[in-house]
Regions:
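Short, structured surface patches at the beginning of a domain
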Residues: 1-108
Length: 108
């Protein structure tokens, strides 16, 4: 399953730019987005208290999570690192489109 996660901090910000960025990224890689999740909440709110927490719990080995930037996951480095580690440990591929990062368990 391929899942996209969008987050903005305020209603004045727009999710559309993130959505378009992810659509282009997915199309370029031949991926079809199965589900879209979005939050309108500060990145300082812990991931378990946002839709992101439910999303992370629902992902299974082999799934793919796409965000535009790792800062969409959280505003604290520790939370970002924990989320990335969780994905790697559970063999979930995490893509960050703007930064060009792909986090996956491929070092073995």
């Amino acid at each position: 399953m391929v899942v996209a996660y969008l987050r903005v901090s305020t209603n004045k910000q727009h999710l559309e730019n993130q959505q378009e960025e992810i659509k282009k990224f997915a199309a370029h890689r031949g991926l079809d987005i199965d589900k879209w999740y979005h939050d309108v909440v500060s990145g300082k709110v812990h991931s378990n208290d946002r839709k992101l927490g439910d999303l992370l719990e629902s992902l299974q080995e082999g799934d793919c999570l796409i965000v535009t930037e790792v800062s969409r996951l959280s505003r604290t480095l520790i939370d970002i690192m924990n989320i990335i580690n969780t994905c790697i440990q559970r063999k979930i591929v995490l893509h960050s489109t703007k930064e060009g990062y792909t986090f996956e368990n491929n070092l073995n």
